[in-house]
């Protein structure tokens, strides 16, 4: 039985149950500020009172573009306590694609009908123009001004079926869709994660995270799941981790962390970047769960991380915990069982490509390896379905569908998208995979599947092979198909720092042909930072394919990381923002 019925109730009462636990926030230099949960209740009440003085009421939507974890968490929870619905938005990653960023942010604020945008002070000169661009948006508020808020809020009744917040999807190929996350689905999923998955729930355990808080894994997993179960949570600024990955393990070591989650790339990055001295200084025997999800899990990455940190930093090798989840299921769907060994299944590649059946390999056959994401949580069910809607037997690949109390209500003000994804009593995930011996194996995305000469080829398998070729930036490879004369052809796009592209292309083509029996028709080499990515760092295959087909791939305007940007574009956005800000001041907004 969950401790609380709503997140609002948890924020108000958890400090009385677990007075010694709370949130710890690091700044970019590593200095830490700690708030016990009783202090969190007081601070969020003050911020909520300030929101009510602005005229915000239960059911209103507000945007959050907040860089600092402390301001984000306290403002988010303040809104939730009074029934104001937060809409988390990512900050601009660079000025290289500012037009696209402003367009998406405008769309999300418009679709959610947000009344107020809370933003970090350093972003205001770029964001103020949105006040004019979004009809419902009344003002932009510097989130730092809420630090001095006084008074106590008046708390309306919050029910389990009330909306807690809206989680907007990346929207790389269409308008973003706002997943409606209720208090009921949050409480159900957080209970499944903490109690069933991690065997916690009585204030025990310490969570450590560097994940962005505007995405579901960071927000639900480390802000909401922890406070609803009285756990302490330590927050590292995302950019601090990106600049120096070892700060993640430092924080776990010092705080005696027990749980942390990250995508596959982070485990590869920290394994690559940590030094011998750092490894020798860490004692990670405290860790019970190094969760891995949000993107395909590479078996070699997992094995490398387990080997390095179990032998050099005293980590329990069973702590590595593959997981499966998605925003429409609130967050998590399945976990590898705690204290069990990480498992994979090696199958016959040709048989799988031709029939979709996962079977042991025949003698001499090419093979494919899939990571088990464990069984689904109690009261939840995952099954694979075929193209005609038939439920498939175990070990046969199809679209994964889910049902259970963690499934969200639908998409905000988008009945067409809701009806397409939430129907027949199931959430249609769009993911490909199979269930075998009660465990979930995720093989890819339905829309990304490549069909070559009648064989189903998963882009992840190609990308992993290419990523192992010396000179290729691991985790920065995209595979897709293009129209050929008689059938689809394979294209591989990669990032590299190498100057000899011709030799690298030859090596890539040879590796793919040898390991998977599929010859690429084209291999494209890009300099670092040119592959399209989402705000959470996920590669965008369909956008990459679209840019490839239109000849836009690799142009300066499409750079996603490390771009300096077009000075004219930046100046234009700042001028619009300054004009909007001046006009609002004159009008008294």
Predicted regions and their residues:
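AMP-dependent adenylate-forming
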Residues: 9-35, 164-166, 173, 325, ...
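AMP-binding/adenylate-forming catalytic domain of the ANL superfamily
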Residues: 476, 514-539, 552-566
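Conserved pre-ATP/AMP-binding loop-to-beta segment of ANL
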Residues: 19-21, 150-168, 174-175, 180, ...
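Structural core segment of the AMP-binding/adenylate-forming
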Residues: 53, 81-150, 263-264, 269, ...
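Conserved AMP-binding/adenylate-forming core of the ANL superfamily
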Residues: 23-69, 73-77, 94-103, 155-157, ...
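Conserved AMP-binding/adenylation subdomain of ANL enzymes
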Residues: 187-206, 216-258, 273-278
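Conserved AMP-binding/adenylate-forming
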Residues: 288-290, 297-439, 447-449
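AMP-binding/adenylate-forming catalytic core of the ANL superfamily
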Residues: 253, 260, 404, 409-410, ...
């Amino acid at each position: 039985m969950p401790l609380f019925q709503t997140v609002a109730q948890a924020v108000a009462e958890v400090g009385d149950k677990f007075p010694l636990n709370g949130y710890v926030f690091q700044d970019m230099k590593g200095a830490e500020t700690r708030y016990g949960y009783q202090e969190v209740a007081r601070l969020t009440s003050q911020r909520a009172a300030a929101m009510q003085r602005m005229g915000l009421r239960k059911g209103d939507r507000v945007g959050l573009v907040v860089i600092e974890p402390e301001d984000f968490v306290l403002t988010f929870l303040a809104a939730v306590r009074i029934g104001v619905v937060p809409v988390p938005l990512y900050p601009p990653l660079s000025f290289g694609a500012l037009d696209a960023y402003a367009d998406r942010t405008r769309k999300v604020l418009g679709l959610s009908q947000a009344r107020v945008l809370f933003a970090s002070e350093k972003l205001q000169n770029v964001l103020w123009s949105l006040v004019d661009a979004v009809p419902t948006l009344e003002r932009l508020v510097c989130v730092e001004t809420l630090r001095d808020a006084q008074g106590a809020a008046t708390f309306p009744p919050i029910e389990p079926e009330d909306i807690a917040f809206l989680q907007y999807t990346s929207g790389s190929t269409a308008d973003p869709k706002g997943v409606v996350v209720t208090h009921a689905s949050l409480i159900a999923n957080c209970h499944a994660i903490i109690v069933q998955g991690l065997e916690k729930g009585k204030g025990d355990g310490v969570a450590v995270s560097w994940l962005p808080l505007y995405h579901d894994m960071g927000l639900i997993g480390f802000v909401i799941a922890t406070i609803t179960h009285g756990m302490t949570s330590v927050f590292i600024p995302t950019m601090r981790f990106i600049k120096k990955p070892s700060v993640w393990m430092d924080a776990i070591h010092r705080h005696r962390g027990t749980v942390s989650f990250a995508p596959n790339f982070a485990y590869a990055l920290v394994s690559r970047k940590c030094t011998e001295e750092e490894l020798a200084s860490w004692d990670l025997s405290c860790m019970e769960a190094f969760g891995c999800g949000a993107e395909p899990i590479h078996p070699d990455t997992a094995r490398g991380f387990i080997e390095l940190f179990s032998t050099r930093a005293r980590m329990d090798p069973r702590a590595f915990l593959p997981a499966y989840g998605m925003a429409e299921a609130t967050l998590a769907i399945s976990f590898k069982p705690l204290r069990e060994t990480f498992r994979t299944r090696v199958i016959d590649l040709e048989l799988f490509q031709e029939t979709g059946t996962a079977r042991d390999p025949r003698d001499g056959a090419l093979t494919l390896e899939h990571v088990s994401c464990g069984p689904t949580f109690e009261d939840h069910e995952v099954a694979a379905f075929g193209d005609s809607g038939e439920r498939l037997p175990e070990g046969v690949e199809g679209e994964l569908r889910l049902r259970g109390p963690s499934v969200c209500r639908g998409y905000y003000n988008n009945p067409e998208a809701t009806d397409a994804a939430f129907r027949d009593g199931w959430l249609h995930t769009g993911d490909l995979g199979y269930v075998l011996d009660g465990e979930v194996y995720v093989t890819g995305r339905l829309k990304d599947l490549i069909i070559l000469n009648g064989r189903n080829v998963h882009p992840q398998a190609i990308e992993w092979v290419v990523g192992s070729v010396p000179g290729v930036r691991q985790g920065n490879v995209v595979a897709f198909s293009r129209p050929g004369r008689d059938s689809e052809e394979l294209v591989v796009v990669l990032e590299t720092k190498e100057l000899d592209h011709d030799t690298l292309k030859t090596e890539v083509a040879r590796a793919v042909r040898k390991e998977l029996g599929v010859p690429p028709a084209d291999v494209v080499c890009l300099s670092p930072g040119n592959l399209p990515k989402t705000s959470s760092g996920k590669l965008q295959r369909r956008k990459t394919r679209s840019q490839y087909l239109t000849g836009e791939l690799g142009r300066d305007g499409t750079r996603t990381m490390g771009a300096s940007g077009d000075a004219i574009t930046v100046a234009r956005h700042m001028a619009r923002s300054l004009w909007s800000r001046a006009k609002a001041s004159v009008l008294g907004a």
